[in-house]
């Protein structure tokens, strides 16, 4: 076993046609849970609809005999969960954040083009290989079609406890979640990668819930006292974190492109400044 969560365990396995795969198995205690099974099969359904180099490919799904275990075989992705990598290394270099965000944005845009909102974007649902700098988006288990009616959405008690810090405010107020919600989540991921902290610092889920609905996020330049970002970088991040979906960028790839441009422009400026300082002090 290479990983486990509340609903499933993940194993490294050999597939007869596809070689090494990640085999995700629904926990036995949940095989009679209709919501858990529906969510598990939904991951396979939506995963097969999004074909993109930055989305983990779904290879096979099924059940091991009548009444058996539900399983999902997906592409084996190199690297590690972005959450773990970022917790060890954040704040990450701006060029690295630009590479990560543009790949996630491109993958999510592909999902949106296929009529799917991911709804659970967070570093824990992203694989990242620091050697190749490749990103792979995971877990469409709570994704929804953009035309899904509110009474058809799958919910579960406690869902927001685990992912509340990355969820868009409109998702908390019962609105039908649109692609703009994924943009908000990606902006939160970018904020975390750049600073090592989050735009809201609540001590409890209840407090976080209240802050998300009623308070503005902490400005990027106030996240860490030793970090300073150019005004354009902060402006892009804060627009992505706007409370109202209509105040964000038109689509997620526009946000990702603007942030990449701002981060790389800042990096060039920083490099020039450092070069001048080294020359001033006679360093090579």
Question: How would you name each of these model-derived features?
Answer:
Residues 60-62:
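A short, aromatic-enriched beta-strand patch in the conserved N-lobe beta-sheet
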Residues 27-49:
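AlphaC helix of the eukaryotic protein kinase fold
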Residues 100-101:
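Activation segment signature within eukaryotic-like protein kinase domains
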Residues 105-116:
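Protein kinase catalytic-loop region centered on the HRD/HxD motif
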Residues 130-169, 173:
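Activation segment of protein kinases
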């Amino acid at each position: 076993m290479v990983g486990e969560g509340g609903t499933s365990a993940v194993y490294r396995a050999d597939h007869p046609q596809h070689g090494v795969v990640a085999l995700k198995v629904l926990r036995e205690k949940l095989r009679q849970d209709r919501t858990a099974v529906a969510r598990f099969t939904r991951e396979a359904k939506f995963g097969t609809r999004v074909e993109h180099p930055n989305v983990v490919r779904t290879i096979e799904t099924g059940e091991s005999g009548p009444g058996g275990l539900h399983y999902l075989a997906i592409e084996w992705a190199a690297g590690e969960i972005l959450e773990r990598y970022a917790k060890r290394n954040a704040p990450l270099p701006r060029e690295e954040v630009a590479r990560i965000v543009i790949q996630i944005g491109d993958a999510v845009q592909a999902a949106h083009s296929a009529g799917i909102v991911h709804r659970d974007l967070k570093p824990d649902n992203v694989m990242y290989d620091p050697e190749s700098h490749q990103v792979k988006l995971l877990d469409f288990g709570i994704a929804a079609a953009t035309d899904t009616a509110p009474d058809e959405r799958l919910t579960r008690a406690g869902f927001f406890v685990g992912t509340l810090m990355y969820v868009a405010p409109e998702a908390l107020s019962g609105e039908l979640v649109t692609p703009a919600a994924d943009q908000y989540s990606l902006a939160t991921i970018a904020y975390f990668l750049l600073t090592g902290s989050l735009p809201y610092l609540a001590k409890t889920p209840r407090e976080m819930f209240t802050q998300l609905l009623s308070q503005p996020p902490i400005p990027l330049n106030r996240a860490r006292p030793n970090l300073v970002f150019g005004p354009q970088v902060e402006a892009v991040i804060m627009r992505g974190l706007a409370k109202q979906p209509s105040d964000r960028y038109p689509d997620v790839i526009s946000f990702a492109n603007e942030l990449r441009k701002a981060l790389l422009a800042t990096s060039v400026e920083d490099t020039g400044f450092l070069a001048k300082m080294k020359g001033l002090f006679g360093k090579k």
